Amino acid sequence: GKRVPVPEGFSAGARCLLESLNVFLSALAIMEQQGTEVSLASPGTWPLTPELTAECFLEAQPIFERQAAIWQNVLEDRADNRELEELDGFINNTSIRLRLICKETAVELPGDMYADCWEKHEIPPCTLVKLPHHGHRDSITPHLLDMLAPKTVVISVSNTRTDDCPAASVLQMVREKGCALYVTDAIPDSNGHVSNHLAIHFDI
């Protein structure tokens, strides 16, 4: 499949986007070879089983149009470092925000969306929310937590991350709201010790 160059002189964020695009292009080529049906996501509600429904939410169209224009320039060998840095600043807000509903249980899966983006919407309460962006400091706000009112909060994060994920301020915020908190990797204490921790597993 097609690959795009990753110029040494580009910023770290721009290079990361180009490397990610190459991973995506490789996966897309494999799916096409296998005859996999691929389509653009669109907002809507879909019954998955008689009891399970999926709701898909996307941000307004201009953000996707800008993203598409930048990627088109890359694919046509006109990659621009400044454009890619611009994209790096908003690409997380192009995430699909997915809500799974089964009877009285609602699970909110907001991708990597920044809190100041999706808290602008009227969002009904949920049973569980997986925090965006590995629990980074910009993943949640008190207002958003009040609106969602989750019983359980899940943070998907690796112990190898060095960018303050999950952020101590986020952990404190969630605990102060009285939510049950689960983290996929144990969080080292102040002495660097990693203890056993509760894990969470879904069967759908």
Residue ranges and their predicted role:
Residues A69-P166:
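Active-site-proximal loop/helix segments of hydrolase catalytic cores
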Residues G1-V107, C179-I187, N191-I204:
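Flexible, acidic/histidine-containing loops and adjacent segments that form or flank the divalent-metal
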Residues H143-A149, V154, R161-I204:
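C-terminal regions of proteins
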Residues V23-S26, I140, S169:
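Short Gly/charged-rich anion-binding patches and loops
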